[in-house]
């Protein structure tokens, strides 16, 4: 069957109405297959689903299925198929939408009612179909069955005809007389609505008197039945009160056991919580050990890196020493060049002196020619002015050279001081780093990075200073070349001056001044050479100091490496101790864990014993219920037997009593050989023994109802029969007030109060032992049962059977038999 078109139409109208009033508004749909895509988020929000965005139809219908399964409509979800609905099956989609509307009717009835009323007033939704569907759901709830709950969605015959087109049925040729329904006889049978078992003929034959007598007889039977039922009701009420009292005691004991179980559960939870805490502590200890090992590995790595960095620093120091050697070699070369320059200056000075002597001789020779050369003085003065300007330029250049040499000296001093400061700073930083590494190994990586950066910067600075020194040396060499060029130029100029002096006597004074200037320049050069010698000496001293510093630094490094090795050995020893401590901690923790496991196992065994005790109590309750049913039977039988013994004469009881323990039967057979006072005196000498039926504790019927004969208990019909009563001391102690008592004359005809032990005490045990020493019990299990020790050897029936049997005690009839003899 397919889905009803009216149902599909009304569902489409309603969902489009919901979509038009929903914020944000959704698009209208023309088929239910588009429901999940356009109205899925709206339906999910109306049903308060967690997921409200759907990429596929499978996800949408799966979410709606889970949501419906958590509501009160979960019993209808067995017939839903999310996969078929996702594939576009109209029946499955209608099922989902119908349950969605039912969910809205249950949880959001006000909103659904307002929407349906407004939609019906606007003629936008056919609400009749939906109301019929809701009525069908109500019928499903009343029938308490969910089979075919979607039957209201299927297409009926009228819908099929409407879908196939209406048409008039063809007229048949049957006559109306041939279609008459057959009827029964005019008179209905009397048994049609009667419940009597007698035949209707017997009812018709009976006379009114017979009917009256039958009704009277039935009335008497019903009265007798009512009377018996009332008596049974009274007995049952008494039994009910007894059982309710026992039930209350059992409930109290059950509540006590539950409280004990709750306490034990709390103890078990505390033990479990303690075990979890210990496991967490173990995990923390493991993490600490792991962290310590990781730190040890990191410290080893940092030590190796530090050793590598120290080796690299040694290599760099060796490079610096090599560079210093090259610098000293360059300084030696410069010293050699300075010596050569000084020798050259001495040679030139000697040559100038020789020239001066020659000039003096020529001066003397030319003094006579001074007058002649006065005219040429003006030209010589001009030449002199030019020479003065040149001398001034030369002096300026010499001053510049001196300033440059001073600057070079200062730069060299600064560079050396910087190198020394950098070496001292480097040593200080190395010492600080060593101390910091020994104090805190965790900061080694950052310090190493800082040292590397600083070392790289220092290398750059050293390279820059070396390059600057090399540039200064190159500049000094260039200046030397320039000075040599200047010296050559001076030589050339001196030669020109000599030529000019030779040419004219007026130029003698100018040449003298030039010589004086040259002398000054030579003196300045000598001073510069001396300063350079001092600089070289200072550099040599600095080199010696640097060598001494390097030696000291090497010694300090050796000492530091030795200290570092000692501290490393100490750290290794401490690490070994820590590892031993961790091993001991692990062993202690394992022992603690095993101890707690044992405690937990003991607690679990204790809880299991409590659970077993509860189960045993439940079994005892079931046994008590069964005993209750047996008690009802026995109470009825006992009531009948008591009535018989109360109403029947002694003769009848004598006929019925077949037990050898029956006292009336014995006296009737043998005659009263002794008087009543003697009998009472004899009975008073014996201890009182209570004999009563243990109806509460025995499940078997010990007697036979009236009118029946038992094959198992022949000859045991007497109420005083010993086999009728159990001889257990606990059962004797649990007898009620209706128990019969054979006692002394003072207590004859009275019921003995039952003994209800409040528990095994020291006094009770003493009383029992004293009694059993005087009169030993018939069964060995009686003492153990009364004391409550089920582990006693006398409580085992097999031990009782295997043990030596005792002689039976003399009964009350032994006295009569002895007197008779």
Swiss-Prot record:
Record's function text: Essential component of the spindle apparatus required for spindle positioning and chromosome movement. Acts to recruit or anchor gpr-1/gpr-2 complex to the spindle and cortex. Also involved, directly or indirectly, in cytokinesis and in the coupling of DNA replication, centrosome duplication and mitotic division.
Q: Where is the composition biased (Polar residues)?
A: 162-180
Under the cellular component aspect of Gene Ontology, which terms does the record hold? Answer: cell cortex; centrosome; condensed chromosome; cytoplasm; kinetochore; kinetochore microtubule; microtubule organizing center; mitotic spindle
Keyword annotations: Cell cycle, Cell division, Centromere, Chromosome, Coiled coil, Cytoplasm, Cytoskeleton, Kinetochore, Mitosis
Organism phylogeny:
Eukaryota, Metazoa, Ecdysozoa, Nematoda, Chromadorea
Annotated Low complexity bias = 181-199
In its UniProt record, a GO molecular function of this protein is: dynein complex binding
Protein name per its UniProtKB record: Spindle apparatus protein lin-5
């Amino acid at each position: 069957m397919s889905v009803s078109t009216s149902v599909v139409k009304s569902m489409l109208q309603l969902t489009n109405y919901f979509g038009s009033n929903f914020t944000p508004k959704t698009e209208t749909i023309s088929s239910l297959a588009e429901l999940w895509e356009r109205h899925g988020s709206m339906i999910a929000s109306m049903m308060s689903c967690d997921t409200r965005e759907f990429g596929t139809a499978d996800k949408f219908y799966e979410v709606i299925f889970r949501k419906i399964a958590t509501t009160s409509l979960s019993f209808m979800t067995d017939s839903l198929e999310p996969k078929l609905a996702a594939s576009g099956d109209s029946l499955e989609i209608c099922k989902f939408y119908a349950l969605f509307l039912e969910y809205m009717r249950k949880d959001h009835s006000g909103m659904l009612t307002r929407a349906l009323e407004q939609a019906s007033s606007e003629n936008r939704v056919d609400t009749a179909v939906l109301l019929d569907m809701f009525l069908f759901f109500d019928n499903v709830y009343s029938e308490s069955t969910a089979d075919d709950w979607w039957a209201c969605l299927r297409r009926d015959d009228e819908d099929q005809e409407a879908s196939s087109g209406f048409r008039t049925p063809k007229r048949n040729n049957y006559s109306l007389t041939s279609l008459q329904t057959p009827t029964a006889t005019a008179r209905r049978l009397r048994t049609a609505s009667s419940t009597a078992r007698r035949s209707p003929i017997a009812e018709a034959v009976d006379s009114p008197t017979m009917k009256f007598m039958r009704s009277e007889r039935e009335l008497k039977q019903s009265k007798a039945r009512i009377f018996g039922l009332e008596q049974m009701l009274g007995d049952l009420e008494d039994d009910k009160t007894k059982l309710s009292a026992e039930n209350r005691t059992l409930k109290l004991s059950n509540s006590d056991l539950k409280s004990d179980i709750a306490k034990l559960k709390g103890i078990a939870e505390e033990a479990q919580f303690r075990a979890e805490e210990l496991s967490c502590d173990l995990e923390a200890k493991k993490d600490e050990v792991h962290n310590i090992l990781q730190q040890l590995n990191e410290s080893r790595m940092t030590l190796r890196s530090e050793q590598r960095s120290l080796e690299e620093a040694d290599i760099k120091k060796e490079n610096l020493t090599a560079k210093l050697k090259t610098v000293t070699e360059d300084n030696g070369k410069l010293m050699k060049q300075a010596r050569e320059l000084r020798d050259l200056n001495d040679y030139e000075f000697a040559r100038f002196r020789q020239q001066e002597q020659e000039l003096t001789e020529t001066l003397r020779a030319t003094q006579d020619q001074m007058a002649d050369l006065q005219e040429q003085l003006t030209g010589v003065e001009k030449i002199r002015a030019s020479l003065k300007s040149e001398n001034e330029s030369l002096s300026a250049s010499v001053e510049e050279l001196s300033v440059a040499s001073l600057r070079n000296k200062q730069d060299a001093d600064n560079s050396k001081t910087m190198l020394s400061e950098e070496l001292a700073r480097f040593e200080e930083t190395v010492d600080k780093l060593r101390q910091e590494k020994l104090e805190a190994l965790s900061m080694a990586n950052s310090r190493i990075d800082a040292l590397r950066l600083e070392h790289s910067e220092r290398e750059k600075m050293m390279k820059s200073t070396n390059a600057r020194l090399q540039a200064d040396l190159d500049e000094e060499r260039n200046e030397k070349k320039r000075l040599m060029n200047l010296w050559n130029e001076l030589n050339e100029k001196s030669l020109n001056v000599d030529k000019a002096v030779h040419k004219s006597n007026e130029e003698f004074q100018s040449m003298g001044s030039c010589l004086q200037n040259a002398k000054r320049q030579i003196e300045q050069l000598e001073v510069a050479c001396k300063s350079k010698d001092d600089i070289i000496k200072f550099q040599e001293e600095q080199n010696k100091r640097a060598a001494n510093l390097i030696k000291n630094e090497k010694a300090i490094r050796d000492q530091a490496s030795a200290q570092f090795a000692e501290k490393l050995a100490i750290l290794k020893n401490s690490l070994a101790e820590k590892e031993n401590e961790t091993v001991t901690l692990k062993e202690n923790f394992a022992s603690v864990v095993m101890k707690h496991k044992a405690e937990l196992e003991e607690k679990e065994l204790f809880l299991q014993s409590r659970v077993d005790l509860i189960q045993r109590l439940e079994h005892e309750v079931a046994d008590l219920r069964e005993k209750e049913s047996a008690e009802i039977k026995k109470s009825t039988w006992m009531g009948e037997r008591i009535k018989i013994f109360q109403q029947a004469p002694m003769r009848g009881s004598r006929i019925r009593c077949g037990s050898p323990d029956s006292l009336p039967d014995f006296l009737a057979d043998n005659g009263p050989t002794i008087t009543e006072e003697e009998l009472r005196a004899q009975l008073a000498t014996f201890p009182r023994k209570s004999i009563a039926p243990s109806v509460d504790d025995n499940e078997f019927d010990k007697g036979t109802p009236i009118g029946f004969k038992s094959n198992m208990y022949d000859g045991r019909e007497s109420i005083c029969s010993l086999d009728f009563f159990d001889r257990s001391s606990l059962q004797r102690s649990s007898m009620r007030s209706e128990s019969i008592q054979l006692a002394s004359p003072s207590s004859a005809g009275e019921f003995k109060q039952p003994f209800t032990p409040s528990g095994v005490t020291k006094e009770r045990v003493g009383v029992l032992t004293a009694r059993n020493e005087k009169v030993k019990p018939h069964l060995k299990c009686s003492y153990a049962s009364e004391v409550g020790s089920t582990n006693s050897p006398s409580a085992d029936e097999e031990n009782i059977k295997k043990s030596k049997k005792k002689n039976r005690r003399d009964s009350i009839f032994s006295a009569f038999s002895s007197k008779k003899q």
